[in-house]
């Protein structure tokens, strides 16, 4: 039997600039690397979306600088905040359409997608995060407003210390009572496309 790992409550001070737009929260990498910055935003979501407790969460991003570190933080906080399972794209990679598909396929309560779209990447570039809800779509304006309001008064967050997940190894891993499944997002999305399109027929068109 896998024993639960101890969680730690970390005292923090709110940041006043964590208002998400339609594409999520986008800032310079250096902003996200400030102490507690990402953790504050994640905790605000966990606090404002209590249905994430005991449910499945999807995680992944576009692979830009800081992606892997952010995913490790999100996993540690998901475990501390009572999520039952997380589905993660292998290597931490997951496009927005693929994440939306996985949220629906695995009946997840939501998902965190780490992307800044076409914005420049790298240590001096941009980073971003957005929360998608259980239908795979983006969070409503009402929800993002509640998350923002909560982020301005947040005083603590919950996390598991010393956790590490091998993002490159497909299959099931455990972090305390949290199940972590690393999936091949290309295979998953290709299977969806094969359901939607008749590729054999399309192949005939091009002959």
Pin down the residues of each PLM region.
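Positively charged, low-complexity intrinsically disordered leader regions
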Residues: 1-42
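Phosphate/oxyanion-binding active-site loops and adjacent basic polyanion-contact surfaces
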Residues: 33-46, 66-67, 95, 181-192
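Glycine-rich phosphate/diphosphate-binding loops that line cofactor/substrate pockets in enzymes
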Residues: 41-57, 196-206
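Ferredoxin-reductase
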Residues: 52-138
